[in-house]
């Protein structure tokens, strides 16, 4: 069985009963599926206006099915319905982000990459501290010798 996630964005100018009715009508097309999770995320501000609307109701459904025609029917009805502003259907088994959290090899590879990144960051910080200490020592040496000390301004001495 393939795992899917659907996010549905319904017009915000409807009252909650009407929005729930729209979402439930579309969800009814997903009969013969095993619904894992059914989230109503409430009225939310949109990042940008869609059809001159600034708010919308968001619904998220997670389910498993083997029948792709149900997904196609849901997509068709969501496009036809004028109260649905946006929808997205994600096959979680083909989604690389999902695979990276489930596949043991990819998890191990990502952990190694994270370790390398942390080591590189620590090495860069250590080198920066060494450069700062060398600069402070040079500055103290020049002051002790009575020579003028040029203040170090980050980026001022670099060639462009």
Curated annotation (Swiss-Prot):
Family annotation (Gene3D superfamilies): 3.30.70.60
Keywords: Ribonucleoprotein, Ribosomal protein, RNA-binding, rRNA-binding
Xref: InterPro entries: Ribosomal_bS6, Ribosomal_bS6_sf, Ribosomal_S6_plastid/chlpt, Transl_elong_EF1B/ribsomal_bS6
Biological process per Gene Ontology, one example term: translation
Keyword Amino-acid biosynthesis: no
A Gene Ontology cellular-component term: ribosome
Pfam families xrefs: Ribosomal_S6 (PF01250)
Bilayer-spanning residue ranges: none
GO molecular function, one term: rRNA binding
Family of this protein: Belongs to the bacterial ribosomal protein bS6 family.
Role, per record: Binds together with bS18 to 16S ribosomal RNA.
Protein name per its UniProtKB record: Small ribosomal subunit protein bS6
């Amino acid at each position: 069985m393939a795992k899917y996630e659907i996010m549905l964005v319904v017009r915000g100018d409807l009252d909650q009963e009407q929005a729930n009715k729209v979402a439930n009508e579309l969800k009814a097309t997903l009969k013969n599926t095993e619904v894992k999770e059914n989230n109503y995320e409430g009225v939310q501000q949109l990042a940008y206006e869609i059809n001159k609307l600034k708010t919308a109701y968001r619904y998220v459904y997670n389910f498993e099915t083997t029948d792709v025609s149900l997904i196609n029917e849901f997509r068709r009805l969501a496009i036809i319905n004028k109260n649905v502003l946006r929808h997205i259907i994600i096959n979680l088994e083909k989604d690389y982000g999902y695979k990276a959290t489930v596949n043991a090899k990819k998890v191990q590879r990502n952990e190694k990459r994270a370790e390398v990144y942390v080591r590189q960051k620590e090495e860069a910080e250590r080198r920066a501290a060494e450069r700062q200490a060398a600069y402070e020592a040079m500055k103290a040496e020049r002051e002790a010798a009575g020579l003028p000390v040029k203040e170090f301004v980050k980026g001022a001495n670099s060639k462009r």
